[in-house]
Amino acid sequence: MIIKYNGDEKFEIKTTEAKVSLSSAGIDIEGFVISTPGEYERRGVSVQGLTLDGDQKPVYIIHTEEMTLCYPDGLNHELDEEIVKLIGDIDILFVPLGENGSMPLKLAQKFISDIDPRVVIPMLYSDIEQFKSAEGITDGEVDQLKIKKAELPVEERKFFILKSNN
């Protein structure tokens, strides 16, 4: 799978079977747009849209290439334990950072800790330095993330800061 960041809350994911776009409009699997809660499957990609605590936008759980991704666009509050269990085991977590419609640093750190993903990819940030410093991230930005299930970290969490292609 190849993940590219297109700025703000937008990502493009290329899998062996499909091109998937993530944005505030929802999940687009080659023209099949998912923007409401429910369970969907298209071209080897399954998506579960969860509505949490009356939020306007669903949190999306995406299963593809034997990996599970969580895309919580618009989430800006703490999750209770029951919701964290509902989200389940996540390999790759997209984290909305910042103040406007996303998560301040402390809330983002708690969200990451609660979900306990193997890989974290920040989004919606204007200044990433405070987050990098708080998490001890020394790696620079990368153009894209190319990853397979076998390459996921086992013992530690890995952070990837993707350069915006926009």
Q: For the regions a protein language model found, what residue spans apply to each?
A:
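Core dinuclear metal-dependent hydrolase active-site scaffold
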Residues: 1-88, 92, 100-107, 142-166
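Short secondary-structure boundary segments
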Residues: 25, 123-125
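A cross-domain feature marking catalytic cores of carbohydrate-active enzymes
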Residues: 74, 97, 124
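Solvent-exposed polar/charged
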Residues: 86, 113-114, 133
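Proline-aspartate-enriched helix->loop->beta-strand connector
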Residues: 91-92, 99, 107-123
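Enzymes that bind and transform nitrogen-containing heteroaromatic metabolites
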Residues: 104-109, 125-146
